Design a protein with these regions (language model features):
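Regulatory nucleotide-sensing modules
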Residues: 1-89, 96-100, 144-145
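A small-molecule sensor/coupling module
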Residues: 12, 71, 77-80, 95-132, ...
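Compositionally biased, intrinsically disordered low-complexity regions enriched in proline and serine
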Residues: 25, 90-92, 114, 138
Length: 145
């Protein structure tokens, strides 16, 4: 998984023992936008649909992950809803389990903050694009009327 590619193998092994297996059926809600995030997810098999009121809908599939920001910034509200687009096998990691392992691997914290920062920047770019498109849409409407 890309999120853990540069991580200490012992750190990854410790986390793997704490992963919880979860199964979702088509159209099951996995994450609700606006709620406080307490865990991240890894897709073992299946496809999920990520829907946000502020960004275009996207799909994630086998090997992808989502919700990682909640491990780094645990009181942040979810910026998107996630639904199963097929029968999904997921593994989840809670913020409590993540932090308990992180206590023994302090150097990993920097790595995860950097990765989370990259994901936040990607989300900001989508939000900016969304607002630019809305602005242009209303300008075109004004010109037509």
């Amino acid at each position: 998984m890309p999120f853990f590619q540069k991580a200490d193998p012992e750190f990854v092994s410790a986390l793997v023992t704490l992963l919880k297996f979860e199964v979702y059926l088509f159209n099951d809600e996995i994450i609700r936008e606006g709620t406080i995030g307490r865990k991240m997810f890894f897709i073992s098999r299946g496809t999920v649909r990520v829907c946000s009121s502020k960004a275009p809908t996207t799909n994630l599939t086998d090997g992808s992950f989502f919700g990682e920001i909640s491990l780094i910034l645990p009181n942040l509200r979810r910026v998107a809803s996630v639904y199963a687009d097929s029968y999904c096998y997921l593994y989840s990691l809670t913020v409590e389990d993540f932090n308990s392992v992180l206590e023994n691997f302090p150097m990993q914290r920097k790595h995860f903050y950097a990765e989370a920062g990259k994901r936040l920047e990607q989300m900001k770019a989508w939000v900016k694009l969304f607002f630019i498109l809305i602005f242009l849409y209303f300008k075109v409407i004004q010109l037509i009327l």
